[in-house]
């Protein structure tokens, strides 16, 4: 068997209203990249992007170029970070356009980044900007939405099972119950099972 390389894909390289409100107009992940400073001798910072420059993910040609570049280096798919907060999606434009247009024609899966968004970048929960709220009702809404993505022919499957990553399984109130519900729903939709991975 051949090992397949899947690159994590952070869809934050374009502005959204929430980030404009929380961090200032025009904020994107490039804001943080460009202001990086060296912390020790020979620490090369900031790293200025090479091949694609300070790209904007709203542009379809950027996404096509990324897929082409990934293929050149042996990457076989993208794992898009997926942000779901009790039915509210953030940073969804890029993935929505990938689904609607069918481009790039490049395999993908999703990683649910189920952490609170906070005022700090250290993973702490001191000042929550938008928080996770878990419930069985939301689990059902979420898997219903996810199944639409699973049905895309580009979606990465392992032995027919859609591959879904979860960032913080320990934050789920009852991970086993959520997994059981999700597996039941994907089976109702014609898949043999769901291939869940913890990040």
Task: Set out the residue ranges of the language-model regions.
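Glycan-processing catalytic domains of CAZymes
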Residues: 1-199
């Amino acid at each position: 068997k051949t090992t397949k390389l899947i690159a994590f894909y952070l869809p934050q390289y374009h502005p959204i209203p929430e980030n404009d409100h929380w961090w200032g107009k025009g904020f994107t992940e490039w804001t943080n990249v460009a202001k990086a400073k060296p912390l020790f001798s020979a620490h090369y910072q900031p790293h200025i992007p090479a091949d694609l420059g300070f790209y904007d993910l709203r542009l379809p040609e950027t996404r096509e170029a990324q897929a082409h570049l990934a293929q050149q280096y042996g990457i076989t798919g993208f794992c898009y970070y997926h942000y779901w907060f009790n039915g509210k999606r953030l940073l969804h434009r890029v993935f929505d356009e990938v689904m609607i247009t069918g481009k790039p024609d490049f395999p993908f899966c999703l990683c649910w980044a189920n952490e609170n968004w906070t005022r700090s970048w250290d993973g702490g929960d001191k000042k929550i900007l938008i928080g996770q709220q878990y419930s069985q009702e939301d689990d059902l809404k979420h898997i219903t939405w996810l199944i639409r993505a699973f049905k895309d022919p580009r979606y990465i499957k392992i032995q027919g099972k859609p591959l879904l990553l979860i960032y913080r399984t320990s934050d789920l109130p009852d991970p086993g119950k959520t997994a059981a519900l999700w597996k039941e729903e994907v089976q109702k939709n014609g898949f043999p099972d769901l291939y869940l991975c913890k990040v």
